């Protein structure tokens, strides 16, 4: 018997086929015990896998004829902690178990059948349950001097008991060193935390292999100890194993192999092996050798020793797979990010109240919270069904005759809820768009399962499969990304407009039935589900993930989401103006993902163009399988025969020295093989750092045009400074900017109340500037920042190489008290090309365009302010998220 994923199911779910099973309380009691245990194990693995993978359905063929669920019960042995996640149903000769996702509010991040981590509790070798295992693992991550395993697992005995254990340990050590024992000798040594007695069974090798992993795991994970095979655990009498039944060489090899195969997980860097010593103690009877006691001394282990791989499962790549030890441990140890160094961020979805695969969601403290965004995008009213978004459904109704009547007819049975329209829910979920889909609409209403309507212009054989896949993907995203913990199924319904087949279910009524508990959708459930939907639609992997060391999601701003929602077939060309820190590059990356799915593109069909290598490398790292990133120079030097769509970022800093880049980009996209492609250009004239012609069309010809005016990057003092510099830039624009280019149509919105630091220091000589930077870097590193938080930027590229060695010399000069501080800074300085690595960036303002760091030093070596100086200053200052130091040398 094995588990397989039913890929031909009519459910929009992950369905695990468990094969044949005997059901019924009495019937299972009467069956062969081994078969009963095996069937139960198969079902539990399927349950565990679905709990950890977003939920789904277990389908089993009922083996015993005449079975009736209502009369006979089930008879499966399911752990109590799992039962509240399950609903059961019989359908003819199949038994269905509906599994909802694991909820981390249970106190552990994922479902586990058995941790296979053991510990000693007085005289017992016990397996740790999931919560005990989690506490143990957290304890093991502490420094060795702070580790007290016993304290982490329960209250300790009084001091007298500790003394008693110490005496036993001494006696056990003496017993371990004895060369011979007497048959039936009664040992003056009871079992304890440090001592375990095990009798040999008939099959010596099997006995050792069965008991030894648990004993070694328990002693290694507690305080070390001794296990004596061949001593009666109740009478403490020496029995041993008869010499005729034991081969010492073979048994030693078996024990060595068994211990070496035990899974271990290291939190330390030394990574030692399990330390143990094996002795065979002779057992004599009336002066003659009768047999042997096998004694094993196990040392306390630095980290974690498992008896075998944890019994925890997941669905991955259409297979039910057991989690490897390393992956299980890492998953168990996942925790919310430490935002103490990110005061501008607020946690909105915590790992402690979500689902196993969800990630923490953080938003800027000045942004609308998750609940407010849900009410903005997806409001819930008690007296009507709300259609949203208004602009989209009105456009669809005006373009497609009969669509309004069709939708209104479908909504008649519902008195309350929200109907969310989309040009393609498939694209919204990261799937490829299907031709012939007019629109999709998701209905969430009280006391009903959510329904996904797909409106086709005509029926074909692929309609059913498409709607099933989209419904399944939506459910998985709501649970695994959105963190929804309730019971959830998405019912797909296909409608064909202007056809005799007005609306038709994609599967028969037999398979539409879900347990009644899945229909229990209260207003509170609706709001929770819609908040998960906000995360699904607006969530993206934050660049903070690299800084925090774990994946974190941010949410798009309102304007970013509005632009992302545009119909790309109708908005082939767009100029997007955005202030520094408004998220232009993030939006550019998301737009390329959408292009891929709307137009069924390969990475070779989508080109991302920017001016500088560092930004190109960042995009290449972030979106390896989405696009082909190049610089403007590379774009102008080469032909791109397969390119159909182009995204241009930081366009205000492009030049025409290598030719008309805008004309070339427009020609490529307008003459693409499959029709006109997408050309979106992101720019900000305020961040122009050169005096050459940019090659952009005049602002009056940049149509259609959109603006992103909400700035969320910078701390309050830096944001205030940027506003001052922007005003100066308007009054003193560089000569190469066309009239009106620094006029924003909408008033900028700046982050307020975010703590940070701004220092402007003038009239220093260059040597004083370099010493200041070196000392400040050391101070920041001592106070919790890392090299990857810091960028030192010069106003000109030529200055970087000119003064680099002098800055390094300043870094080398340390007082005696500093000799044992941070690791060698000389090995932690590099340019902006590898901005994601853990080093201090030393580069020019121009090459750092489009990037950011928590701490930025801007160095002006003391030249007369050139034309466009304020724009260059804006480029510099806007790179800093929390601390900005502007150091000006005297002219």
UniProtKB/Swiss-Prot annotation:
Record-listed ATP binding positions: 578-585
Keyword Hydrolase part of the UniProt annotation: no
Sample GO molecular function, one term: ATP binding
Gene Ontology biological process terms in this record: cell differentiation
Keyword list, A-Z: ATP-binding, Differentiation, Isopeptide bond, Nucleotide-binding, Ubl conjugation
Keyword ATP-binding: yes
Any single GO CC term annotated in Swiss-Prot or TrEMBL for this entry: nucleus
Location in chain, cross-link Glycyl lysine isopeptide (Lys-Gly) (interchain with G-Cter in SUMO2): 59
Family label: Belongs to the Schlafen family. Subgroup III subfamily.
Record function comment: May have a role in hematopoietic cell differentiation.
Protein name: Schlafen family member 5
Organism (species): Homo sapiens
């Amino acid at each position: 018997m094995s588990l397989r994923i039913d890929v031909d199911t009519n459910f929009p779910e992950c369905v695990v086929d468990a094969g044949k099973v005997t059901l019924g309380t009495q019937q299972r009691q009467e069956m062969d015990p081994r078969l009963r245990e095996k069937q139960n194990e198969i079902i539990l693995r399927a349950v565990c896998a679905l709990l950890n993978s977003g939920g789904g359905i277990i389908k089993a063929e009922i083996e015993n004829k005449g079975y009736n669920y209502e009369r006979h019960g089930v008879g499966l042995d399911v752990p109590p902690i799992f039962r509240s996640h399950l609903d059961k149903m019989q359908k003819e000769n199949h038994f269905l178990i509906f599994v909802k996702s694991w909820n981390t509010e249970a106190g552990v991040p994922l479902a586990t059948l058995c941790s296979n981590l053991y510990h000693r509790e007085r005289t017992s070798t016990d397996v740790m349950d999931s919560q005990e295992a989690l506490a143990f693992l957290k304890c093991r991550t502490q420094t060795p001097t702070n580790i007290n395993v016993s304290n982490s697992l329960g209250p300790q005995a009084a001091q007298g008991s500790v003394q008693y254990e110490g005496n036993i340990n001494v006696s056990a050590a003496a017993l371990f060193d004895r060369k011979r024992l007497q048959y039936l000798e009664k040992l003056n040594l009871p079992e304890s935390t440090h001592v375990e007695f095990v009798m040999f069974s008939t099959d010596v090798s099997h006995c050792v292999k069965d008991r030894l992993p648990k004993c070694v795991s328990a002693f290694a994970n507690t305080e070390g100890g001794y296990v004596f095979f061949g001593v009666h655990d109740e009478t403490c009498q020496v029995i041993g194993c008869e010499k005729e039944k034991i081969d010492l060489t073979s048994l030693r090899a078996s024990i060595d192999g068994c211990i070496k195969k035990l899974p271990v997980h290291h939190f330390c860097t030394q990574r030692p092996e399990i330390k143990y010593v094996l002795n065979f103690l002779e057992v004599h009877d009336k002066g003659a050798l009768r047999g042997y006691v096998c004694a094993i001394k196990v040392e306390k282990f630095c980290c974690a020793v498992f008896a075998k791989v944890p019994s925890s499962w997941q669905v991955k790549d259409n297979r039910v797979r057991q989690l490897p030890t390393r992956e299980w441990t890492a998953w168990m140890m996942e925790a919310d990010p430490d935002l103490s160094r990110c005061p501008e961020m607020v946690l909105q979805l915590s790992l402690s109240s979500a689902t196993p695969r969800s990630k923490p969601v953080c938003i800027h403290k000045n942004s609308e919270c998750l609940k407010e965004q849900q009410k903005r995008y997806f409001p819930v009213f008690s007296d009507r069904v709300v259609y949203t978004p208004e602009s989209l459904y009105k456009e669809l109704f005006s373009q497609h005759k009969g669509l309004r009547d069709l939708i209104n007819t479908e909504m008649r049975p519902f008195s309350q809820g929200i109907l969310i329209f989309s040009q393609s829910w498939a694209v919204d979920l990261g799937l490829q768009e299907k031709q012939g889909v007019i629109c999709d609409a998701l209905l969430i209403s009280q006391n009903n399962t959510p329904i996904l309507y797909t409106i086709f212009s005509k029926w074909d054989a692929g309609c059913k499969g498409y709607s099933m896949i989209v419904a399944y993907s939506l459910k998985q995203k709501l649970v695994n990304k959105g963190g929804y913990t309730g019971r959830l199924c998405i019912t797909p319904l296909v409608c064909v407009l202007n056809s005799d087949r007005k609306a038709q279910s994609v599967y028969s009524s037999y398979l539409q039935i879900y347990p009644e508990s899945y229909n229990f959708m209260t207003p509170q459930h609706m709001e929770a589900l819609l908040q998960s939907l906000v995360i699904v639609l607006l969530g993206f992997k934050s660049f903070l993930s690299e800084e925090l060391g774990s994946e974190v999601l941010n949410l798009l701003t309102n304007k970013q989401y509005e632009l992302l929602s545009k119909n790309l077939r109708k908005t082939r060309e767009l100029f997007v103006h955005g202030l520094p820190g408004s998220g232009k590059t993030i939006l550019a990356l998301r737009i390329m993902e959408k292009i891929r799915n709307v137009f069924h593109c390969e990475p070779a069909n989508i080109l991302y163009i920017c001016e500088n290598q560092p930004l190109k490398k960042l995009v290449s790292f972030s979106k390896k399988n989405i696009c082909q990133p190049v610089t403007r120079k590379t774009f102008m030097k080469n032909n791109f025969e397969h390119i159909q769509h182009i995204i241009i970022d930081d366009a205000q800093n492009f030049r025409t020295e290598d030719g008309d880049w805008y004309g070339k980009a427009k020609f490529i996209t307008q003459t693409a093989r499959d029709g006109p492609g997408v050309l979106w250009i992101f720019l900000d004239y305020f961040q122009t750092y050169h005096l050459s012609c940019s090659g952009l069309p005049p602002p009056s010809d940049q149509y259609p045009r959109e603006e992103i005016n909400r700035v969320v990057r910078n701390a309050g003092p830096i944001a205030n400074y940027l506003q001052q510099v922007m005003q100066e830039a308007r009054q003193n624009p560089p000569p190469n900017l066309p009239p009106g280019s620094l006029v924003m149509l909408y008033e900028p919105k700046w982050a307020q109340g975010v703590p940070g630091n701004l220092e402007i220091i003038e009239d220093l000589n260059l040597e004083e500037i370099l010493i200041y930077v070196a000392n400040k870097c050391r101070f920041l590193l001592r106070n919790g920042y890392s090299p990857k938080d810091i960028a030192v930027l010069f106003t000109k590229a030529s200055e970087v190489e000119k003064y680099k060695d002098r800055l390094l010399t300043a870094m080398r000069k340390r007082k005696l008290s500093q000799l044992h501080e941070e690791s060698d800074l000389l090995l932690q300085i590099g340019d902006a090309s590898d901005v994601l690595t853990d080093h201090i960036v030393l580069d020019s303002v121009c090459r750092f365009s489009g990037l950011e760091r928590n701490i930025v030093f801007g160095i002006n070596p003391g030249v007369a302010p050139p034309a466009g100086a304020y724009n260059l200053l804006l480029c510099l200052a806007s790179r800093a998220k929390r601390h900005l130091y502007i150091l000006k040398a005297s002219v």
